[in-house]
Amino acid sequence: MLKILQARLQQYMNRELPDVQAGFRKGRGTRDQIANIWIIRKAREFWKNIYFSFIDYAKAFDCVDHNKLWKILKEMGITDHLTCLLRNLYAGQEATVRTGHGTTERFQIGEGVHQVCTLSSCLFNLYEEYFMRSTGLHEAQAGIQTSRRNINNLRYADDTTLMAESEEELKSLLMKVKEESEKVGLKLSIPKTKIMASGPITSWQIDGEMVTDFILGSSQITTVGDCSCEIKRHLLLG
C-alpha cells in the first residue's frame, strides 16, 4: 500500500519540484549538488566573489504540521482522494511521555512525519517546496549568474544551500527563507547553519558560524575552490 502511495506522490514531485531539489528523486542525488565545487572554481577564475549559507533546520521532519501539510498538498494539486488516504495514515496518533515522576496521559500527535516511512521524504519535499515558492527565490535576481540561468539555492530534502555574489544578497535570501519557513513551523538551527565566503566581509550580520570549508554530501567544499584537500581526504579514507 505504501509503495502505491509513494508512486502516486512521486508523479506529483516530478511535476512540482524544481531541478534544484535533488533529495529522494529518481536519477538525482548528492552528486548533483556537489556542482557547488565547480561553481566556486569557475567563479574564482573570473575573480567573482561568492557567498554560501548551508542551512540546517531544527528537527525538520519532526516539525511538519499535519493540518498545514494537508492544506499544502491540496494547493500543490494533489487529489482529495490521495490526500484522504494520507490523512488516514496519520489519524488518531497518540503518545505518552514517561519520566522519573511517572507517565503522562495520552495526547494527540499533530506534528511530524515518520522518518522510517517511505512516504515521509515525499511529503517533506512537497512541504518545503510550498514555502520555498513563497520566498520568491525563483524570481530573485540575487544568486550566481551562469550563461543560461541564475542559481541561488540547491537542495537535498531539508539540506539547503543558498548562494549569492555579495553578502547583502545572501543575507536577503537567508532572511526570506527564515521568515517563510517559520510560517509553516520550521526553524533554522543557528548552531548548525554555516556561512562560507570566498570574498571580503565588510559588515557581517548573518546568523551562522563562519567556516572556510564544509562537507556537502560526501565532498569537501573550500573557500578557495581547491580540490587538493578533497583528494587528500579520500586518500586517507582509503
Residue locations for each model-derived region?
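Nucleotidyl polymerases of mobile genetic elements and RNA viruses
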Residues: M1-G238
